Curated annotation (Swiss-Prot):
Pathway: Amino-acid biosynthesis; L-histidine biosynthesis; L-histidine from 5-phospho-alpha-D-ribose 1-diphosphate: step 5/9. The active site is at residue 77. One of its GO terms (cellular component) is cytoplasm. It comes from Buchnera aphidicola subsp. Melaphis rhois. Keywords: Amino-acid biosynthesis, Cytoplasm, Glutamine amidotransferase, Histidine biosynthesis, Hydrolase, Lyase. Its main location: cytoplasm. GO terms for molecular function: glutaminase activity; imidazoleglycerol-phosphate synthase activity; lyase activity. Residues 2-173 form the Glutamine amidotransferase type-1 domain. Its EC number is 4.3.2.10, 3.5.1.2. This is Imidazole glycerol phosphate synthase subunit HisH. It is found in: Cytoplasm. Heterodimer of HisH and HisF. It catalyses: 5-[(5-phospho-1-deoxy-D-ribulos-1-ylimino)methylamino]-1-(5-phospho-beta-D-ribosyl)imidazole-4-carboxamide + L-glutamine = D-erythro-1-(imidazol-4-yl)glycerol 3-phosphate + 5-amino-1-(5-phospho-beta-D-ribosyl)imidazole-4-carboxamide + L-glutamate + H(+); L-glutamine + H2O = L-glutamate + NH4(+).
């Protein structure tokens, strides 16, 4: 089984690759259209700026390729946000529009931004992504932007207000 990690130029690729290797796979880090289309599973990680990540995907001619993917596709952190339609970052930015939901600066109230730490995640509906993971398990977060709760939300967490911790539409998580 082939696993491709899309290189957005702004992520912790080594950590992701190592984690996938520990699961018994030999992932390939790539921006090659051929690699992505032939992969059995695809990961889109990201840390930092949505603007920078979208620019790399655009320069690599991957924006439309990603939208056409039929295989399981997992966006991690910023990668999940990129699946949305729009980000309020950088005075507004169009994203991949796979999930019709905006990404806004996290409403942290009096809590500090970025949100940095472990949160309990509430699973909203059964999903293969959370198979063998207990409801209210802790996950690590480091972000200033979030995806609102929508019909695509499969898990949520609270940091002043609830936001999507995981989303899913068809083969995209």
């Amino acid at each position: 089984m082939s696993v491709v990690i899309i290189n957005t130029g702004c992520s912790n690729l080594s950590s992701i690759k190592y984690a996938i290797c520990r699961l018994g796979y030999n992932p390939k880090i790539s921006t090659s259209v051929r690699d992505i289309l032939s992969a059995n599973k695809i990961l889109l990680p990201g840390v930092g700026s949505a603007y920078s990540a979208i620019r790399v995907l655009s320069e690599s001619n991957l924006l439309n390729i990603i939208k056409k993917c039929q295989q399981p596709f997992l966006g991690i952190c910023l990668g999940m946000q990129l699946l949305s339609a729009f980000s309020s970052e950088a005075q507004g930015l169009d994203l991949l529009s796979i999930i019709n939901s905006p990404v806004y600066r996290l409403n942290s109230g009096s809590l500090p931004l970025p949100h940095n730490g472990w949160n309990n995640v509430e699973i909203c509906r059964n999903n293969v992504l959370f198979e063998d993971i207990e409801n209210h398990s802790k996950f690590y977060f480091l972000h200033s932007y979030s995806v609102d709760i929508t019909k695509y939300t499969i898990a949520k967490t609270l940091y002043n207000t609830y936001f999507s911790a995981a989303i899913q539409k068809n083969n995209f998580w």
